[in-house]
Each structure stands twice: as C-alpha cells, then as structure tokens.
Regions:
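N-terminal loops that bind phosphate or other acidic moieties
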Residues: 1-46, 56-57, 61-173
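Glycine- and acidic-rich phosphate- and metal-coordinating loops
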Residues: 53
Length: 173
C-alpha cells in the first residue's frame, strides 16, 4: 500500500541519517517523477513519500515531471517566483536569480527571514502537482532537503507516513 521514493542516493542517505529509515526498501526514480507516479498508481499503491533535494524537486513545483536538466532547468526562476510570493525584497530575488545552484540561493533566502515560508509554499506546490498527476488515486507526501542545510520542509502528513510504514511492516523505522 505504501511506497517510498527518492530521485537518487542523496535522498536515500538523507532519510537514513535524519529519520533512521533504511531506504534500501524504497524506489529510486532518477529524473522520472511523473512516470514513477504513473507506475505506483498502476501497481495499486495508495500512499507515496517522495524525498528529494531542493535542486531536483523545485522543478516539480513548476509542474515539471521529468527533472533532467536537458528537459527543463528553471530552478532559480521558480525559487525567485516563490520568493516574490512570500514578499522577499527585490534585491535578494535578483541575487537568487544570479545563483548557479539552489544550495547557493538558500543562505540568501535565509537572510531574508522568509526561508521557512518559501519552502513550505514550495512543498505545497510540489504536492499539488504530484497529486494532480496521480489523479486522486495516490496520496503523495514530500520531504524537501538541502545537503548543507538538512530538512527544509515537509508536507503535513509526511511524519504520519513513517508511523504507517512501521505498523504495516512491524518494525522500527
């Protein structure tokens, strides 16, 4: 009924280090977020937890389901748009747009005092697009992190997800 998914090894490492969850029992989906959702629905899963780096999953917040850079790379533009929504001053938004990586942009947003609100909004948007893709057939939760900053935000039900897994699998997570 439940499946844990991460685009790559960093997500697996983050989950093990932060939550003690061994994602060897999970699925690595690479850049194919949309296809992974389609397969999970087809296989009859009811819940999915997607854990990923801000640099990968920010694209999903823009509705992009194949996150490979050759398909789309609007990471800074999306980060800037969510920053505008949360009222970040224009000079900091310009600085974000000049960044090469999302990790580089995070201290700028942290300095604005709006980082938690921005990340929460991004996770909400990621979940919106994930569930839109699933067409109501799969509840999807999300945990967003950065290598240097750890967990940035998670969907409201993400923590409950671990309890469900523990009950179903009868083991400590």
């Amino acid at each position: 009924d439940y499946v844990a998914v991460s685009p790559g090894n960093y997500g697996l490492d983050f989950m093990k280090k932060t939550y003690g969850y061994d994602l060897d029992r999970s699925v690595k989906c690479s850049n194919f977020i949309g296809d992974t959702i389609d397969m999970a629905v087809e296989l009859g899963f009811k819940k999915m937890l997607l854990t990923g780096h801000i640099g990968k999953l920010i694209k999903v917040a823009g509705g992009i389901m194949n996150t490979h850079s050759k398909e789309a790379d609007c990471r800074m533009e999306l980060l800037a748009a969510f920053s505008v929504k949360e009222g970040v001053e224009i000079e900091k938004i310009r600085q974000v747009l000049d960044c090469v990586t999302t990790e580089e942009a995070i201290p700028i947003l942290e300095d604005s005092g709006k980082l938690p609100a921005i990340m929460e909004t991004i996770v909400e948007r990621i979940c919106f697009y994930l569930e839109k893709r699933a067409k109501g057939k799969l509840q999807i939760d999300c945990i967003l992190y950065a290598n240097e900053f750890g967990e940035l935000a998670k969907s409201k039900e993400a923590v409950k997800w671990f309890t469900l897994l523990e009950q179903e699998q009868g083991q400590s997570i």
